[in-house]
């Protein structure tokens, strides 16, 4: 069965880049800009993994969405994406599984996805 990945990022070109790359590797990638309520989206799509941007352009940050995600599902893997080189949070304390620095080179993200899903 094809694994489903929910990509949440406010930047359209990032969503499209991630979706294209993930689908080329055989995953089913669903995207959101973060403006839709995350819990109904999770109920509808039932992702196996969430790739979540930390800095969204809406009223909520990715960390806010992560808290909502964890209120519904403690077990779904979440990879946080950031444009910042240094991420000053303890992943365990914020309930994330991994984080990656956004880059044109998606090898780090793909490595984490494969580690989780394969």
For the regions a protein language model found, what residue spans apply to each?
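Alpha4 helix (beta4-alpha4-beta5 surface) of REC/receiver domains from two-component response regulators
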Residues: 64, 84-102, 107-111
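Two-component/phosphorelay signaling modules centered on CheY-like receiver
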Residues: 12-30
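Hydrophobic/aromatic residues positioned on beta-strands within the core alpha/beta folds
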Residues: 79-81
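His-Asp phosphorelay/catalytic-motif detector in bacterial-type signaling
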Residues: 46-48, 72-77, 89
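Conserved acidic carboxylate
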Residues: 9
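Short amphipathic alpha-helix used as the core "switch/output" element in two-component signaling
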Residues: 40, 61-74
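Active-site residues of response regulator receiver
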Residues: 53-54
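Acidic, metal-coordinating helix/loop segments flanking the phosphotransfer/catalytic sites
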Residues: 31-49
């Amino acid at each position: 069965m094809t694994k489903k990945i929910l990509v949440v990022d406010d930047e359209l070109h990032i969503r499209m880049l991630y979706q294209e790359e993930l689908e080329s590797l055989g995953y089913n990638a669903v995207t959101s800009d973060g403006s839709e309520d995350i819990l109904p989206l999770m109920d509808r799509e039932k992702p196996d993994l969430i790739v979540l941007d930390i800095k969204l352009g809406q009223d909520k940050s990715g960390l806010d969405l992560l808290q909502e995600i964890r209120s519904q599902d403690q077990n779904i893997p979440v990879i946080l994406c950031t444009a910042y080189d240094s991420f000053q949070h303890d992943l365990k304390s914020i309930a994330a599984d991994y984080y990656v620095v956004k880059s044109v080179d998606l090898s780090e993200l793909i490595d984490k996805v494969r580690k989780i899903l394969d």
